[in-house]
Amino acid sequence: MTALIHLNGPPGIGKSTLAARYADRHPGTLNLDIDTLHHLIGGWRTSQGQFHDLLRPLAWAMAGTHLADGRDVILPQYVCDLTQLQIFEQVAHDADADFIEIVLLDDRDAAIERFNSRDDGSEWTRHNNELVADLGGDEFLAGMYDRLLSLLDARPDALVVRSVLGAIDGTATALDRALETVRAQG
């Protein structure tokens, strides 16, 4: 069955990398990385430029259209707002698709360090690093991590996949196994 696969997790945990790999191995899958859509909205570089509220409705429409055509969508995006998550779930159900939640996790301190050590030289990464610093840096990231753990209590069907720094192949294999398990359960 067609599915909207939501890869949740703290910033820098590997969501985008794993989603891109998954989409490459599954032709026709839409890699709906919302962070790549920011460049389409004027003013995204400003520190006040928090455009997720503008982009999520676009993502819902894109996901719904792709799912309705019978194709999978993988969504690598940190989402801890229960209402936002439920909307993505409803988009999947409206298209007669499954909604599969995978949460990528590392230890809290390791997750924070992973965010702080990533630097691909891109304008987006610089912008994101500045934004996080302006919001409180490590303390802000720790709060994001803690909210994600709290969300898991409200989302018992979400599967946790351990994301280990430097072990992208192993994490990708663990993700594939988790998805196989969910799909086998139907």
Range-by-range predicted roles:
Residues 54-95, 99:
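Glycine-rich phosphate-binding loop used to anchor ATP phosphates in small-molecule kinases
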Residues 10:
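P-loop (Walker A) phosphate-binding loop of NTP-binding proteins
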Residues 13-69:
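Conserved substrate/cofactor phosphate-moiety recognition/catalytic segment
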Residues 7:
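Hydrophobic anchor at the beta1->P-loop junction of P-loop NTPases
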Residues 95-116:
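Conserved phosphate-donor/acceptor-positioning beta-strand/loop module used by diverse small-molecule
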Residues 1-4, 71:
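Pre-Walker A (Motif I) flank of P-loop NTPase domains
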Residues 31, 99-101, 158-162:
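Conserved beta-strand scaffold positions in the cores of enzyme catalytic domains, especially
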Residues 120-171:
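Small-molecule kinase domains that catalyze NTP-dependent phosphoryl transfer to phosphate-bearing small molecules
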